[in-house]
Amino acid sequence: MALKHFKPVTASLRGTVLVDRSELWKGKPVKGLTEGLTSSGGRNNHGRTTVRFRGGGHKRAYRVVDFKRRKFDVAATVERLEYDPNRSAFLALVKYEDGELAYILAPQRLKVGDQVVAGVKVDVKPGNAMPLSAIPVGTIVHNIELKAGAGGKLARSAGTFAQLVGKDQGYAQVKLMSGELRLIRGECMASIGAVSNPDHSNQQLGKAGRKRWLGRRPHNRGVAMNPVDHPLGGGEGRTSGGRNPVTPWGKPTKGAKTRANKRTDGLIIRRRKVGKG
């Protein structure tokens, strides 16, 4: 998909750059593959804000996506490519030979009419899924499981991918886009190719309203607040805050390490590249 550049015929179109979605399906999703979705507005079950600057946005239906790809050796044909308001990547509606319909993450270079299949001994081509132990070293993959049968967890956003760089003692060595190199069990499934919509990160929304349609509210800086509202607030005139970046509750942020899962530290060969913190 290409990018659409708009002429500045109105103030809000000046500088606007959006993904051209003209090749995607223009109708509604398959009703049997959708569920109701209630907007939380960034609140938890106590009604307290757990994620700031969320709320509003267009009403959505959740598309049930098959992240597990455990229907082995049954070929499926790509019926259409669809937009999904719940994620940055596009979806592919596939129809199996037995008539079952399913949504999968659409990889790059997957077209309507293509055939995809999951299994141990299948071709290495975009959209096919197989265990990491059966994938050749050097292959670009996405939708990678961390636990066998739990469904893909890594490399699911638009344009993302990981690379299989080695295999050893039942584990696969996978290099992620963050620079992290980690071990994943060879039985875990992964899909071939990179995720669709790589131009998602190159969009310029052009106006605040388009951000509101996506459910994002205005983001207020801590240094622009009063001392009662934020550790960086206050000061006569504009200040730089006077201390390292912190959350409204005083915890270090912007690069400070927060990973606490020591149980799987041994599976990380090289940590991801991080900034200062």
Swiss-Prot record:
Which stretches of sequence are listed as region Disordered?
216-277
| rRNA-binding keyword on record | yes
Q: What InterPro entries does the database record attribute to this sequence?
A: NA-bd_OB-fold, Rib_uL2_dom2, Ribosomal_uL2, Ribosomal_uL2_bac/org-type, Ribosomal_uL2_C, Ribosomal_uL2_CS, Ribosomal_uL2_dom3, Ribosomal_uL2_RNA-bd_dom
The UniProt entry's GO CC annotations, sorted and at most eight, read: large ribosomal subunit
SUPFAM superfamilies, sorted: Nucleic acid-binding proteins, Translation proteins SH3-like domain
Q: Name one GO biological process term.
A: cytoplasmic translation
The organism's place on the tree of life at top rank: Bacteria
Alphabetically ordered keywords of this record: Ribonucleoprotein, Ribosomal protein, RNA-binding, rRNA-binding
Q: Name one GO molecular function term.
A: transferase activity
The UniProt similarity line reads:
Belongs to the universal ribosomal protein uL2 family.
Its assembly, as annotated, is: Part of the 50S ribosomal subunit. Forms a bridge to the 30S subunit in the 70S ribosome.
Role: One of the primary rRNA binding proteins. Required for association of the 30S and 50S subunits to form the 70S ribosome, for tRNA binding and peptide bond formation. It has been suggested to have peptidyltransferase activity; this is somewhat controversial. Makes several contacts with the 16S rRNA in the 70S ribosome.
Q: What is this protein called?
A: Large ribosomal subunit protein uL2
Instruction: List the source organism.
Output: Acidiphilium cryptum (strain JF-5)
